Amino acid sequence: MPFPRHRRGFTLFELLVVIGLIAALSLVLLGGLGGGGKSAALQSAQAVLANLVSAARTKAQADGGGTRLLINIDPANTADPSRFLRYIAIQTQVAGVWQSATVVDIYLPEGVYVVPGNFASIPAGLFSTGTAAPWTKSDSAPLRSTALRANQIISATINSPATEQWVSVGFAPAGTTAQSGDIILAGGHPRAPGSFAPGESPVELENPETIRGLTLSAYGLPTLINDRASF
């Protein structure tokens, strides 16, 4: 008599994603109970981002193919402006071809955005000018996500009918990356409709003093960074 076949268990990749999202949700709930507000949202976003990086790295190693983390940097999507600097996806590469279906896609918590890299063009109005502190690092360099490189900007249609601009962070089958550097998160808010011109940023980042993020090593390993002075 044949025994019934049981469904397979979670893969390591799936467990990483689930555990990370549960941890991030816990931070939001605890922060909400304690009145943490934006600080809790930043902590949650940091946990989500680190988990996505680890998941992309693990997936590359498990499949023996490349993966990439994609961050939406397109300010012109009027159909869903909430994707700008908040929507992140993981794609896999099979036989040298990037697969259109994403293995993971998620929005960062509301009110938290990825700070762009040193791109040739950054939409006007993104960085608040109403803060006493400038948008610079401790060494006076611009406060930018150095792991997000201008030469890794692509146009792609991902979970939307629109073709948008994305910046990618790639992982090799060994789990390594050629894009070591920082990925910075900052609090912000959508700008009021009609208050900005086409092509300008639909969101405004609020305060360079309250940021979090991570530093990505060449081995693809994230290290959490909790304040501006540490970037």
Residue ranges, per PLM feature:
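N-terminal helix-rich module
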Residues: 2-3, 10-13, 28-58, 62, ...
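Residues within membrane-spanning alpha-helices of integral membrane proteins
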Residues: 20-21
